[in-house]
Amino acid sequence: CRATPQLIPTHPAQHILTMTDKLWCAQHLQQHHIATPQTDDAPQSVEALRAQLHKQRRYAVFVKPRWGSSAAGVMAYRFRPNEEQLITTARLVDGQLVNEKRLHVYRDSASISVLLQTILSDGAVVQRWIPKAATSGGPFDVRVLMIAGQLAQRVARVGNGAITNLHIDAKRMSAEEALDSVGPHVADRVYFVCQQVADSFPGQLVLGIDVMVDAAGRPFVIECNAWGDYLPKLLHHGQDSYDSQVHALFGTAA
């Protein structure tokens, strides 16, 4: 009879489901007492969202597709009764929402309403907007890879606004350099939190964690990615992220 090849599970299905659902992921982090911005299921209409924010006196939030990645459809929304601002990579083209590799800033209520409604209708979350600490180049967050539960590649993503993904032209910076610019031991606090996250997803080979710190150096986990390992030319102990995964599985580099 033919021998059955041994399968090595690297990403438990339930972990993938949890991390690809922003609401479930936030609830998972909260259940494990890991600091994360307050994240709630969003109303399905712009009017209900504005009423909710006004009632709660929340004037700066992120509205994000509940299922999505790469900042697609993410909207940084400032709301006051007589003034609004929306920052996003999305724009409307012939009635269709198009994601672009740059940020757009909207200030007219009509455009903001259409953009928000498009995202809300498909299912979204509302996340508290905590201002990110800034280094000399601007506000930043950090992508941290945990491979087989261990700290691996990491990089600061320095932008010129609220959304700092690398593919929309945020600049790379050493994570330690960026975190040290905020204050002493900030990097240690960030990596401690990342270890907590990794421990909460046992059996996960690769975990990409997006972490921000506020001006006081307090870390908050923004999102978790079931992969998040596309970080070209970023090395840890001389290995890129794919070498590190092969080493973790087989004890040798690719």
Task: Indicate where each model-derived feature is located.
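Conserved N-proximal alpha/beta basic substrate-recognition cap immediately N-terminal to
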Residues: 1-52
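Short secondary-structure junctions
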Residues: 33-35, 57-59, 200-205
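Coil-to-beta-strand transition motifs
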Residues: 34, 69, 137, 148-152, ...
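Short, flexible loop/turn elements at secondary-structure junctions
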Residues: 43, 67, 130, 148, ...
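Phosphate-binding site of ATP-dependent enzymes
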Residues: 56-166
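Active-site proximal loops enriched in glycine and acidic residues that flank catalytic Cys/His/Asp
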Residues: 128, 155-158, 209-211, 223-226
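Short acidic loop-to-beta-strand element that houses the catalytic metal-binding Asp/Glu
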Residues: 143-144, 210-212
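C-terminal active-site "lid" helix and adjoining low-complexity regulatory extension at the edge
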Residues: 167-206, 213-254
